[in-house]
Amino acid sequence: MNNLKQGKFITFEGGEGIGKSTQSQMLYEYLQSQNTPVILTREVGGTIVAEKMREILVHEELLPISELLQVMAARYDHMARKIIPALQEGHIVICDRFIDSTVCYQGLELENGIDLVYNLHKTLMPSLMPDITFFIDVEPDTAIKRVNSRNMNNKFDIRGIDFYKKIYYCFKELSNRFPERIKTIKASDLSPLEVHELIKKHL
């Protein structure tokens, strides 16, 4: 575990419409029921400043490098003000999206983007990576149907199936590259409770 922290850092990753936020909330409530010190947060966002940056990110069309730097600026504020202090106090921190989402959403738009994002994170941040990441694996066709059935309110929701596939296969690649950290939960045909039970087995 990173010597900057005493707690545990858990992240949830995947594309749109796959149930990440639901699973983050369910794990948070489960750990609370066990009297475990835990906080739930999200990216992009998590602090007052970062949430303001999120509004620009999800509703405005930015140039690729501008979008990446916007995400990194929001993350730095989030980590410094919320994540690191909580970890240092011994809390479990659950975060709905983190560095891997930046790789897949912003990095793919840039040449050598995967390595660029990870290297930028290591340079600007205090080398903090999740202890465990849950990739909620839902097939793109299923995910886009779920998104289309709800109120779409940001630029990522309304993109087509090709975008969903690109993001999906990026997360698949990352899970193959970092199998010790990233745990794949195949969730296309499972209920939220069944997914939650699988996640608990990895804790």
Curated annotation (Swiss-Prot):
GO CC annotation: cytosol
Pfam family, one: Thymidylate_kin
Binding, ATP: G14, G15, E16, G17, I18, G19, K20, S21
Transmembrane segment boundaries: none
Catalytic activity field: dTMP + ATP = dTDP + ADP
Enzyme class: transferase
Keywords: ATP-binding, Kinase, Nucleotide biosynthesis, Nucleotide-binding, Transferase
Keyword Nucleotide-binding part of the UniProt annotation: yes
Annotated EC: 2.7.4.9
InterPro entries in alphabetical order: P-loop_NTPase, Thymidylate_kin-like_dom, Thymidylate_kin_CS, Thymidylate_kinase
HAMAP family: Thymidylate_kinase
Protein function: Phosphorylation of dTMP to form dTDP in both de novo and salvage pathways of dTTP synthesis.
NCBIfam families in the record: DTMP_kinase
Name the UniProt record assigns to this protein: Thymidylate kinase
